[in-house]
UniProtKB/Swiss-Prot annotation:
PANTHER family: HOMOCYSTEINE S-METHYLTRANSFERASE-LIKE ISOFORM 1 (PTHR46015:SF1), ZGC:172121 (PTHR46015)
Gene3D superfamilies associated with the record: Homocysteine-binding-like domain (3.20.20.330)
Reactions the enzyme catalyzes: S-methyl-L-methionine + L-homocysteine = 2 L-methionine + H(+)
Single biological process term from Gene Ontology: methionine biosynthetic process
Species in which this protein is naturally found: Arabidopsis thaliana (Mouse-ear cress)
Top-level lineage group: Eukaryota
Residue ranges of domain Hcy-binding in the record: 8-327
InterPro entries found in the cross-reference section: Betaine-hCys_S-MeTrfase_BHMT, HCY_dom, HCY_dom_sf, Hcy_S-methyltransferase
Keyword Cell membrane attributed: no
Subunit organization: Monomer.
Keywords: Amino-acid biosynthesis, Metal-binding, Methionine biosynthesis, Methyltransferase, S-adenosyl-L-methionine, Transferase, Zinc
Disulfide-bond pairs as recorded: none
Residues annotated as binding Zn(2+): 245, 312-313
Gene name as annotated: HMT-2
Protein name, UniProt field: Homocysteine S-methyltransferase 2
Length: 333
């Protein structure tokens, strides 16, 4: 698939045998390759300093079996780039660049696909691949940990959130992405802002909504997961809903709650379960699960109703390859 030809996640899933693989962590993978992301722009810093690295990591995930790759724009905002001294035009260009790099990686992957389906454990199979333009929350822009609390203060209203995100969404939607991945949504008000912006008409492509939880019951702000999902359910342009950046042990219970209030495909891409120290801005070692334990959950998630699976922070192409292998016998291809 190429930009703007995608409309229905259900149709896409028919082409992928009922299940699809989402890529894994980007920022933590950049760091694993040696990138220094100690910056308010976080992974978006690589759009300026090392676009070749972004291309490489996208390609690694495609060769691991990912059917959907997300652009390196989670923490990329016009306001964030302007705070670093970039002009409005340069800031918008960097947003577009995030999607262009992902689409170029998809093209590079297709070029590598020959008659062989694998090589050196690489999955080289021409198949429908979606490019999702990643959009993080207002809290991600603040880079103060509020994306993990959802607490923005009384001064942040629905209209202010819409004004903050509006132009960013327009630029990303016009950059050739197939859909927008609204990720790590921490509260109900921001979900409503995203739904309103999708319905305003300036954003011509659909999106998915993915929330995060720290207790396995509610989203991180304490808002009801079912109320948050209901906002997405009532927005026609939302084509899938689910959970990301949440420990694997919480996923099954959350999915069972989500399934009660949605008819849309359900996606999950948890983190490794490791704890993140927001004050020190680093991951706490030995607090998560390894790939083998992570992938052991996959069957339960599918049985609970999940059809799109991947990974978030601290997951790698190795994780995604293992998920791909788990799906082989479940797919109706």
């Amino acid at each position: 698939m190429t930009g703007n030809s995608f409309n229905s996640m259900k149709d896409f899933l028919k082409q992928t045998g009922g299940y699809a693989v989402i890529d894994g962590g980007l920022a933590t993978e950049f760091e694993r390759h040696g990138a220094d992301l100690n910056d308010p722009l976080w992974s978006a810093k690589c759009l300026v300093t090392s676009p070749h690295l972004i291309h490489t990591v996208h390609l690694d995930y495609l060769e691991a079996g990912a059917d959907i790759i997300s652009s390196a724009s989670y923490q990329a905002t016009i306001q964030g780039f302007e705070a670093k001294g970039f002009s409005r035009e340069e800031s918008e260009s960097l947003l577009k660049k995030s999607v262009e790099i992902a689409t170029e990686a998809r093209n590079s992957y297709y070029d590598k696909c020959g008659t062989s389906s694998s090589m050196d454990d690489k999955i080289l199979k021409k198949r429908p691949i979606l490019v999702a333009a990643s959009v993080g929350s207002y809290g991600a822009y603040l880079a103060d940990g509020s994306e993990y609390s959802g607490i923005y203060g009384d001064s942040i209203t629905l209209e202010k959130l819409k004004d903050f995100h509006r132009r960013r969404l327009q630029v990303l939607a016009e950059s050739g992405a197939d859909l927008i991945a609204f990720e790590t949504i921490p509260n109900k008000i921001e979900a409503q802002a995203f739904a309103d912006l999708l319905e305003e008409g300036d954003v011509k492509i659909p999106g998915w909504f993915s929330f995060n939880s720290k207790d396995g019951v509610n989203v991180v702000s304490g808002d009801s997961i079912k109320e948050c999902i209901s906002i997405a359910e009532n927005c026609e342009k939302v084509v899938a809903v689910g959970i990301n950046c949440t420990p694997p042990r919480f996923i099954e219970g959350l999915v069972l709650e989500i399934e009660k209030v949605t008819s849309k495909p359900i996606l999950v891409y948890p983190n490794s379960g490791e704890s993140y120290d927001a004050d020190r801005k680093e991951w706490v070692e030995n607090t998560g699960v390894g790939d083998e334990d992570f992938v052991s959950y996959v069957e339960k998630w599918m049985d609970a109703g999940v059809s799109l699976l991947g990974g978030c922070c601290r997951t790698t192409p190795t994780t995604i390859r293992a998920i791909h292998k788990r799906l082989v016998n479940r797919r109706s291809l």
